[in-house]
Curated annotation (Swiss-Prot):
PROSITE patterns: LRR (PS51450). Residues 147-185 form the LRRCT domain. LRR repeats lie at residues 46-67, 68-89, 90-111, 112-133. Gene3D superfamilies: Ribonuclease Inhibitor (3.80.10.10). The lineage of its organism: Eukaryota, Metazoa, Chordata, Craniata, Vertebrata. It comes from the Eukaryota. Pfam families: LRR_9 (PF14580). Keywords: Leucine-rich repeat, Repeat. InterPro entries: Leu-rich_rpt, LRC72, LRR_dom_sf. This is Leucine-rich repeat-containing protein 72.
Amino acid sequence: MSWDPNPVPRTLRCWRLRRASETALQSSRRAVEDQLKICGHRRDADVFELFLSKKELTEVIDLSRFKKLKYLWLHHNKLHGITFLTRNYCLTELYLNNNAIFEIEGLHYLPSLHILLLHHNELTNIDATVKELKGMLNLKILSLYQNPLCQYNLYRLYIIYHLPGVELLDRNQVTEKERRSMITIFNHKKAHIVQSIAFGGKVDASWDPKSPFKQKPAQRVPSDFAFANNVDKTVLDDPEDAVFVRSMKRSVMTLTSMNWDTVPTREERYLEEEGTETAQMLTVTLR
């Protein structure tokens, strides 16, 4: 172990850190006030957007005073975390790319978020990141590329699986093929149900190749208890699977072909009989 001839006292180190934090917050406060002056806002309730990009910010003051803030630009700074957005429930677009953010704790307070850019940061924990974003039901556009967590195997499918509402991930549209692959890889139970229905088989709700415990067998309704025109239905333990199976059974197939009874014969066309009906299409719907 190397010996430092001039050790810095612990109290002095803490004082320096506190002093640096205060200086960073003062710089952030000045940047916010400058933006308010530029936009001519006199009341916090009038602030709908803030441009704080490229300000060399390492910390940001609490922005909860801006209740109606909807658009926030903080890209190209030196931020390490997100602790300044606790009551900005109206925020819909947040630009945090090109920083040094290593955790995003605090984003789950933003239920209205629609666009979130986090590329070019230092995010490493993919599970913690997904956990923080799961509650954002309105999130449609997300960017996480150029983060260490992108090196995980099947990273993109993992994000799509846990955030099914996202439509544009890392500047690429989420495709139906990716969604099917995601179900096959991460949701074995639902994939098994889909395959069973597709091939006319019965659904075994207790099937789960990765289950660490023994599941209860699927309950069955007595055969003499009828529902509408169906008898002996399978009751699934998971309500989501029950809804999924029901939606699959409601699929409708429509077949369209020419109604040849309405097509005039060659003789009829030759004689040009009056009252000859024009050819019609015949549509058959199967449920």
